[in-house]
Each structure stands twice: as structure tokens, then as C-alpha cells.
Amino acid sequence: MSLRVTFLGTGGAVPTTERAPSALFVNREGDRLLFDCGEGTQRGMMRFGTGFGIDHLFVSHLHGDHVLGIPGLVQTLGFNDRAEPLTIHCPPGTEDDLHDLVHAVGHDPAFQIRIESVAPGEVALDADGYEVRAFETVHRTKSQGYVLEEDDRPGRFDRPKAEELGVPVGPKFGRLHEGEPVEAEDGSIVEPDQVVGPPRPGRKFVYTADTRPREGTVAVAEDADLLVHDATFADDMEDRARDTAHSTGREAGSVAERAGAKRLALVHISSRYAADASPIRREAREAFDGECLLPDDGDLIEVPFPDADE
């Protein structure tokens, strides 16, 4: 069961030739989710092969580098004869401005757009096998991040034990794995907990968007399989990061380390590092012992299950 993250835009407020403004495409077993939609997002979708077929758009806040791609994307979806509704999730109090932005091309969209506010701590999307929740961030305007967390999976099935207990090979194996008792060949009843291990955790993906480091993010990102965190500046611009309510690479690394995240991806890289952003990653690595990534636009990460190596 796949969980793929494509980085469509990894840059800060000012685009560069190499980095577009914020946009992140997540494909979870065919469910296609877009997190933020900065200028140039639809071109990134074409260039990096994600396609336009998004089911939900999650907006972190209404700064231009996170939303100015919405009018063009909506127009293109209409040109492509989209018929399915599109749900846009946003922070409370931003619905009217987002509505105006959606209609900025001067006419009504060719398909239904639902704009739904979601407060930090609330579930934005309750889907089959996972949910997406909003969480509070600290920025210069009303903003929030999002966490995608999968349901627990059934434990590992012990086939040798099932055969030893007299369960015939076949459909009864699947019924046991799904939690249903079955009858063995000798007429005895075999319970699932006799042949199925404890539940195994699903995957957790966390996207902060623009934020200062905060304890709340550490809690939300606990044991995250992938944490995508604001890392706009290196240490040489720490005061600037504080003044603009962003994070440095080292601060992002510290959040990831305290959360026990497995992988950290650094995004929202300031244009001042267009020639060389390596100091941001180097400083993050000094604070974080896990895998630390500085994605380029177009990079794709496959998020494995927590027990993939077992």
C-alpha cells in the first residue's frame, strides 16, 4: 500500500529558477491530496507527472506563496472538463478570502468547489484507512499544519501456528487475519489472537507549512515517518527567522529530534540560498540523528511502514 510524497514547490516566498513556492502532492493508494498551492503548482504537476486529479486541497494559510496557484489550477481543471467536486480545507476565518481567490479569474468555476474550514485539532478528512487533522502553527497570520495518520493495521499472521492448530489452508486464514474466529479441522474454535500478532501502526506524515518551532509540533509529530518542516533560513539568519515567524534548519532538526521522527524534509528554502542551500541541511543534521533531506522540486519520497525493516 503506497504513500508517495512529491515536492512540487520547495522554495520560500520568492520563487527561483530551481525552486517554486510551496506545494506538496501526496498520493495515498490512489487518494490524491494537495497541500498548499503556490504560484506554478499546475506547471509542477505537469512537469513531475502527478497529474491534475486531486481530491482534496489543504491550505495552511493565505500568504500568496501558498495560494496564488489556486486560480490557475481551478481554471485548468475546468478546461479539462472536471466534473467531480473539489474540497478545499482552510483555517477558520479564511473562507471568504479563499472564495474570492477561487473566483479571481472572473467567472464561476466549471465544477463545484466546497470550501470547508477546519480548526486545529479537528479532522479535516476522515477517509478509509486514514485521517487528516489540522494542528496549530505559529506564523504572522492565521495558519496551521496538517497531519495524515493511518489506522493501525492487523498484526502479522502466523501461518505455521494456524496450520499447527488445524486450520485448513484457504479462506479461513483471511478470516482469522480480519479478526473472525474459525473452526479447525477437528471442530475446535481457533481465535484470531492465537495466530495474529498485535496491531501494527500505520504511517504518519506531518506538514507544518510556515511556522516557528513549537512544542505543539513536537507532540503532533511524535514518531512521524516523515516530517516536512519549514526551514527557511540557516543559522546566519536566525534573527530574521524569528522576525518573520519562520524556522531555521537547526530548529527544524531539533523539532524532529525531540519528536522522534524517522525522516525530516526541509522546505520553504529562502531565495537567498539559491546558489547553495547546503548549510541549512548541515545545521539540521547537527540537531537531528535521523535521515535529513533537502528535497529539490520534483523529488518523490516513498514513505515506508514503521515496521518495514522487520
UniProtKB/Swiss-Prot annotation:
Protein name as annotated: Ribonuclease Z
EC number: 3.1.26.11
Its biological purpose: Zinc phosphodiesterase, which displays some tRNA 3'-processing endonuclease activity. Probably involved in tRNA maturation, by removing a 3'-trailer from precursor tRNA.
Binding site for Zn(2+) 1: H61, H63, H139, D210
Active-site residues, Swiss-Prot/TrEMBL: D65
Gene name linked to the record: rnz
Cofactor(s), names only, from the UniProt record: Zn(2+)
Enzyme class, UniProt record, top EC level: hydrolase
Disordered, as annotated region: 150-175
GO molecular function: 3'-tRNA processing endoribonuclease activity; zinc ion binding
Family (UniProt): Belongs to the RNase Z family.
Catalytic activity: Endonucleolytic cleavage of RNA, removing extra 3' nucleotides from tRNA precursor, generating 3' termini of tRNAs. A 3'-hydroxy group is left at the tRNA terminus and a 5'-phosphoryl group is left at the trailer molecule
Keywords: Endonuclease, Hydrolase, Metal-binding, Nuclease, tRNA processing, Zinc
Subunit annotation: Homodimer.
Superkingdom of source: Archaea
